[in-house]
Design a protein with these regions (language model features):
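A short, charged helix-loop
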Residues: 114-137, 141-179
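N-terminal glycine-/serine-/threonine-rich phosphate-binding loop
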Residues: 2-69
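Glycine-rich nucleotide/cofactor/substrate-binding loop typically near the N-terminus or early
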Residues: 51-122
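Active-site loops and adjacent core secondary-structure elements that bind or stabilize anionic groups
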Residues: 164-355
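Structural motif
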Residues: 20-23, 44-45, 64, 88-91, ...
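Anionic-ligand anchoring segments at beta-strand to alpha-helix junctions in alpha/beta enzyme folds, i.e.
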Residues: 48-57, 61-83, 295-298, 307-325, ...
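Gly-rich Lys/Arg/Thr-decorated short loops/hinges at beta-loop-alpha junctions or inter-strand turns
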Residues: 13-20, 81-88, 122-130, 150-151, ...
Length: 358
């Protein structure tokens, strides 16, 4: 059966949209007051909930509680705050569409042009080792609903989901009190990514709770990743474009100082890094490795070369080598044919003698 596809809805096509009313509801209060003051300076009406409203009022800002705006109090211990037609209607209606404009006017709904929110700290709750019920209670419902409503209607509504976005938002407002479409579209993409990561974290955690045994593998595993770096190409030169992504919140163990590595280069780097790190930790000796096409052509330790090794490796005086240089010579000369054009890894800061042999 063919899927039913909803057609687009016609409305005003404007690049710059003035911010007249904003709804702020955040768990992370970083930068909140500064943003609130910037909005107030542009005569933006502020709507808010709970602790966010309290923080804004403490800074001397005038705020209307969402409950007062909707005429419906928060209920169920805060579980239901913003799930109301006056909130979602104000976010979702298409500006300039006659039917939508008539509907919101009849219902007494005011337009909401900016939504600033972040979600309950579910991941942090799990990381603390909280019990099942506490983790479930920290699954946000109203936040993701507003986030998706705002991001969907980004043609007219700006959605900010992180304090790191506030500076760019304030800069845009300071120009003319508006946000450009390019910013709204960019922030909407970030919002959908934020929502996807949030739901992926919950889904993976929940799947783990269903495991038959404590050490059993979960039946579902979802990951969210971000761009780490573009790559020269994939496995082979014709595989372009190519890029490396890393799980959100993680970092690479090293930096690329110059050049544009390909996919195999990065695999060599990651594997060689792990090998020399483990050798250094396990044996407490400088270590080196020579990698080619994700396989070690050789690995060496900083142990003084004997006479036969010096002859084989063409080393006149082994005492002239530092332990790290010795480790590199051992790794590189283990199979010099296979090491041709290799990726070299060393466990310590490269000294002059090691560099000479490299």
């Amino acid at each position: 059966m063919a899927a039913h596809i909803i057609g687009s809805i016609g409305g005003t096509q404007a690049d710059s949209v003035p911010i007249k009313r904003a709804l702020l509801s955040v768990s992370d209060k970083t930068g909140l007051v500064e943003l609130g003051k910037a909005l107030a300076a542009k005569n933006v009406e502020l709507l808010s909930t709970g602790g966010t409203a309290k923080a804004l009022r403490a800074a001397g800002l005038q705020v209307q509680d969402v409950a007062d705006y909707t005429g419906f109090p928060e209920m169920l211990g805060g579980r239901v705050k913003t799930l109301h037609p006056k909130v979602h209607g104000g976010i979702m209606y298409v500006r300039g569409n006659a039917e939508h404009e008539a509907s919101v006017k009849e219902a007494g709904i005011k337009g909401i042009d900016l939504v600033v929110l972040n979600l309950y700290a579910f991941e942090a709750t799990v990381a603390k080792g909280s019990d099942f019920e506490t983790c479930v209670e920290n699954v946000d419902i109203g936040g993701p609903s507003m986030l998706r409503s705002s991001a969907k209607n980004h043609r007219y509504v700006t959605i900010a989901t992180a304090p790191s976005q506030y500076a760019e938002l304030i800069s845009a407002l300071n120009k003319d009190g508006c946000t450009p479409y390019s910013l709204r579209k960019k922030f909407a993409a970030a919002a959908f990514a934020h929502s996807a990561r949030y739901d992926a974290t919950i889904a993976s955690w929940f799947a783990g709770q269903l495991a038959s045994e404590p050490d059993a593998a979960p039946t579902l595993l979802t990951r969210s990743c971000e761009l780490s770096r573009p790559l020269k190409y994939g496995n082979n030169p014709h595989q372009k474009p190519a890029a490396l992504y890393r799980p959100l919140g993680s970092t690479e163990p090293f930096r690329v100082r110059n050049g544009a590595p390909g996919y195999i280069n990065m695999l060599d780097a990651f594997n060689a890094f792990q090998l020399v790190r483990e050798l250094r930790k396990a044996l407490d000796l400088p270590a080196a490795a020579s990698f080619k096409h994700v396989s070690p052509a050789g690995a060496g330790l900083g142990v003084t070369l004997n006479a036969s090794e010096c002859k084989a490796y063409d080393i006149a005086d082994p005492s002239s080598l530092t332990p790290l240089a010795t480790a590199y010579v051992r790794a590189r000369q283990a199979d010099p044919l296979c090491s041709f054009g290799d990726f070299a890894a060393l466990s310590d800061v490269v000294d002059e003698l090691s560099l000479i042999h490299i």
